[in-house]
Regions:
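Conserved N-terminal entry element of GNAT/NAT acetyltransferase domains
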Residues: 65-79
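Residue-level recognition of the GNAT/N-acetyltransferase active site
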Residues: 14, 26, 152, 183-185
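Conserved GNAT acetyl-CoA-binding A-motif
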Residues: 172-185
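Conserved active-site tyrosine of GNAT-family acetyltransferases
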Residues: 192-193, 197
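Beta-rich strand-turn-strand
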Residues: 22-34, 41-44
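Conserved catalytic-core motifs of GNAT/GCN5-like acyltransferases
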Residues: 181-183, 198-216
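Flexible, glycine/small-residue-enriched loop-and-beta-strand segment within the central core
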Residues: 1-27, 65
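Acetyl-CoA-dependent GNAT
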Residues: 72-75, 83-154, 165-167, 171, ...
């Protein structure tokens, strides 16, 4: 038996969720896609996607490894990756940059024509979830410059960026490149450092109107 205590707020249960018998889900809670709720749990706050959660109150005890599909991105993907880019910058990067800075940075992706130019100059790949939605993307050019790496705010810490980085590093080797260079944000620096990238210099790089702090990093393959 399963109890939903809704009061005035809705409960959202996303696709491929399993909820054990005797569980109680309180008002306003969202249970993310692919998650498992243990029997008899009391879900008092939202549960993220792809995890196992149990207890009273219900807590995440294990992350489930989601399966992603990698494919090249084309012009028809522009609207989706533009929205992902904007939302990621405004949310994920806001912990390291001011509101004015992230808004200026996000505005760099407003132009569809600019995205077309980027797709023409770089090889873009996307990571897709089980529903075919793009949850992250990255790009590399034939000279070994890693141009972009962005992961949807709801898919942070779930292996998306690690998979994308592995794929673009394979691309670089295929180009015959022995060193990758990349400009990374304050937010992304720890991720790249853990994967063997070294800071060459700190700089102030122009976004749209403003100059933001980032780092030139390199890795020898």
């Amino acid at each position: 038996e399963l109890f939903f205590r809704t009061k005035a707020l809705p409960i959202t249960v996303e696709d491929e969720v399993w909820i054990g018998g005797g569980s109680i889900v309180l008002a306003g809670v969202t249970i993310g896609r692919g998650s498992v709720i243990g029997a008899g749990s009391v879900v008092t706050k939202s549960i993220p996607a792809n995890c196992v959660a149990v207890g009273n109150p219900c807590k995440v005890i294990k992350w489930l490894k989601p399966k992603y599909k990698i494919r090249p991105l084309e012009e028809e993907d522009i609207l989706e990756i533009r929205e992902l880019f904007r939302n990621t910058v405004l949310t994920v990067n806001s912990k390291d940059y001011t509101k004015e800075e992230v808004e200026d940075w996000a505005s760099c992706g407003d132009s569809v024509e600019h995205w077309k130019e980027l797709l023409a100059k770089n090889d873009y790949i996307g990571a897709l979830d089980g529903q075919g939605r793009i949850v992250g993307f990255s790009s590399m050019n034939t000279e070994g410059y890693l141009h972009s790496m962005f992961v949807h705010k709801d898919w942070q810490g779930k292996g998306v960026a690690t998979l994308l980085l592995s794929e673009v590093e394979k691309m670089a080797r295929g180009y015959g490149v022995h060193k990758i260079s990349v400009e990374v944000s304050i937010t992304a620096r720890p991720f790249f450092e853990k994967r063997g990238y070294k800071v060459v210099k700190e700089q102030r790089a122009r976004a749209n109107r403003l100059y933001l702090t980032n780092y030139v990093m390199e890795k020898t393959l």
